[in-house]
Each structure stands twice: as C-alpha cells, then as structure tokens.
Design a protein with these regions (language model features):
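Active-site microenvironment for binding and transforming phosphate-containing groups
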Residues: 1-172
C-alpha cells in the first residue's frame, strides 16, 4: 500500500493506493485484481475486493466501484444512486461520509481528489484518452457544482512511466 504524504495529514479522509500484490488472483491477473469486468474468476475478484475493504476498514457494501471506459464521464454519488455500487464512468465523487471510492488501474493514472473545507472526495481513472478528453477538468467541474472551493487537493498514484509506454507518432 502506498500513501500520499499530504493526504495522510488530513484527519477526515482515509486513502491509499494498492499495488497488484497481496491478493487471490492467479495467472495473468496475479494477484490483487479488483476488475469485475476482467475475465478473472469472480470469486477471486470478490475476495480481493473484500481484502481491500478490510484494509480500508469499511464494509464491502460501502466500496464504490466504476466500470471504467476510458471516457471523460464523471458521476456524483448521492443518496439516490448509492445502491448502484458500480458506475459507468471514469471518475466518481461524493460528499457522503462512510464510503470508499475505488479506481482500478494497471498502466493508467489513478488520481484522488479532496476538498478539505467541504469534505468532498473523488477519484479518477486517467488514461491517455480520458486525459485528452478532459476527465480531470470534468472532475473538478463536478466538484465546483458541489460548492467546492479552490483548495482541492489531488494525489497522483502509481502508473506506467514514459520509458515503458510506446505510442505512434500520430499520438503527438
């Protein structure tokens, strides 16, 4: 588990970035695969999600997941939609206490957001396509719709590096 030094100083938020190690999955999904849409055994994925929930000290019923589509779509989780548990988007945010927001990445960039004054949390899956199409800007705009101020903190998690990621020239 990895932590943001800055986020560790905030009293009202618990956060971490998990590595791929320490779970139940085997083979190409070894070992902490939390991707419900993967072809991994659903039992392994659910066991991994339960492990994450325990480490975060919350009920697995309070772990909010996304079906990530490399889009720029952001969903605000509220009392009306909280029971969906899995949202088709690449960012989720909420003001509700007692919930954990999750983003699953391999190469893409996980980002955690926090408005310390208004107690708004969010997380985003920023792949190159979503980043180019505004996932970060859209996430911040949704924060502002919830009356966030300009003191939104962000922590960027582990992701693929430039030396390990090839793109065609037309990408630039």
């Amino acid at each position: 588990m990895f932590y943001s030094k800055k986020f560790k100083t905030f009293k009202n938020i618990n956060h971490c970035f998990f590595s791929r190690k320490g779970g139940f999955s085997k083979g190409i999904y070894n070992s902490l695969n939390c991707g419900l849409s993967s072809e991994d055994s659903k039992t392994n994925v659910l066991n991994n999600l339960n492990l994450v929930s325990k480490k975060m000290n919350i009920s697995s019923k309070k772990l909010m997941l996304m079906y990530q589509t490399h889009s720029s779509k952001v969903i605000v989780i509220n009392k009306k939609n909280k029971n969906l548990k899995k949202f088709q988007s690449d960012a989720i945010i909420t003001k509700m206490k007692g919930y954990a927001l999750a983003v699953v990445t391999a190469d893409c960039v996980p980002i955690i957001f926090y408005d310390i004054k208004n107690k708004i949390i969010g997380c985003a899956h920023a792949g190159w396509k979503g980043a180019l199409n505004g996932i970060i800007e859209n996430t911040l705009n949704e924060f502002k719709k919830l009356n966030a101020n300009n003191r939104i903190y962000a922590s960027v998690g582990p992701c693929i590096g430039k030396r390990s990621y090839e793109v065609n020239l037309d990408f630039y």
